[in-house]
Amino acid sequence: MQTLIENVNIITPGEDIKTHQNVLIEDNLIKTITHDKISNDCMVIDGEDNYLLPGFIDCHTHIFAKGFHKEENMANPLGIHFYNAVPHSKQTINAGVTTIRDCGSADLSFKLAQQRKLFIAPKIHLSITPLVMTGGHFDLLLPSGWDMEIMYPGFPKGRCDGVEEVLKKTREVKRAGADFIKV
């Protein structure tokens, strides 16, 4: 399937705005950008007075989170968070964000489902769970003694102290599918 965006202004980082360009898209990939007329039998979008720019990258998101409500997180199985994240992912794409770095909430199954195009979502880079020191940000051991850290299969606990524990926890998080380590 081909789509042609005619007469659009293109913003590319580090370059001047290119005006009145024609962009041919084939199978969701840009095939041609030219000032010349393109005659193809395809869907045509009039881009006059509009701008086309590269997708944004959200470097810090929690795609599964709808705020941090410990009670809700504890009451729901992981699948509920997954299904809540699907429409959030589509909203993210519709806002022009084509890549996200999830800094602790999404698991490997979500990334694999996105890669298999089971739903509309940006490209996902996972941290699985952040590494935290005892008493630090995201250490959910409460003064009452209750540990509010949510445990799901595929989510190693993030609490670690000292070099040896951090190295071991890093290996566990990488094994769970992390693309990067959040500390």
Q: What residues fall within each predicted segment?
A:
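Extracytoplasmic/periplasmic beta-strand context in beta-sandwich domains
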Residues: Q21-N22, M43, P122
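Short, hydrophobic beta-strand segments that form beta-sheet elements in well-ordered domains
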Residues: I30-T34, V44, I100-D102
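Metal-coordinating catalytic core of metallo-dependent amide/deamination hydrolases
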Residues: L118-V183
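Divalent metal-coordination and catalytic microenvironments
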Residues: V8, V23, N28, D49, ...
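Short acidic/histidine-rich motifs immediately flanking catalytic phosphotransfer sites
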Residues: N40-C42, A178
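Metal-associated gating/positioning segment near the N- to mid-region
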Residues: N50-R116, G135-L140
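Hydrophobic/aromatic beta-strand patches that form the interior of the parallel beta-sheet core
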Residues: I5, M43-I45, H125
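N-terminal metal-binding scaffold of metallo-dependent hydrolase/deaminase domains
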Residues: M1-S39, N50-L52
